[in-house]
Amino acid sequence: MARNLSTCLSPVVLASVVGACAAWVAPAVQAEQGRLIATGGASSIEGGAGGGIIPWAMLAGYDEQGEWGGNAFATHVDLPDYTLDVVGAAVSYGNRVEVSYAHQRFDLGSLVSKFNLPEDNLTQDIFGVKVRLFGDLIYDQLPQVSAGLEYKHQNDFLIPSLVGAKRDSDVEGYVTASRLFMGAAFGYNVVVNAGLRYSRANETGLLGFGGDRRDTRSVLKEGGAAILFNPHWAVGMDYREKPDNLSFAGESDWADFFVGWFPNKHVSVVLAYARLGEIATLDNQNGTYLSVQGSF
């Protein structure tokens, strides 16, 4: 999975899937009540608020100080040889702390017959916590900066162990910063995100953690940007760098290019083109990403 995707932003990162784009509505936009529409973000494939393939600094829901908020989501990624389905939910309190959960199912498709595999899918459970450290997406002089931890457990470790993975569960951390720049793109507002992840997950953990080539964590770059055309529509992209821990196959960086629709504070839909590159020896795994989220 050579990092040929590095140039594309984390294998399509599910085409900025994550609706990260939405999470950054212009401060000039009027909110229904409290926080602005879309500032709760979309849901990443690992459960936390942000873009499709990476977390951003915003938290799930539309809660303010002393309030609860959250969301539930379903995501489907259709690739030439695989499919990925994710369901999950996140709860936040006081726009300060977020707790999330995601269940991933990765159908192996043509890889099953190619290698006569004993299983036709891989599943993973992810439990996350994210804390807003300081700053604000819009109103503070400093960008909003958050830090998070994710505990991941791969539920079907036979195949990962056969290809060289060292463990079926692990903890990884990340720090991420997001900022909205008003009128920065021909008068349209722009949201920019940058982050670092400390991880040894193979294909985000679906192929276990660590490997015969490398069994230590790596510092990995993540980032994204979105243009907000109005309070309800955004387009953007995400990028996610990934490690190369397994000798049996390379691992591509991911990128995505997305369109996000946020009709109100309770519903969001993200459609993206995900460029995921090589996955488990099969190249050109680029396809469509669709995510639907309900928020409160």
Residue map of PLM features:
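Outer-membrane beta-barrel proteins
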Residues: 108-113, 154-158, 201-205, 246-248, ...
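Extracellular/periplasm-exposed beta-strand and loop segments of Gram-negative cell-envelope proteins
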Residues: 109, 118-120, 153-168, 205-207, ...
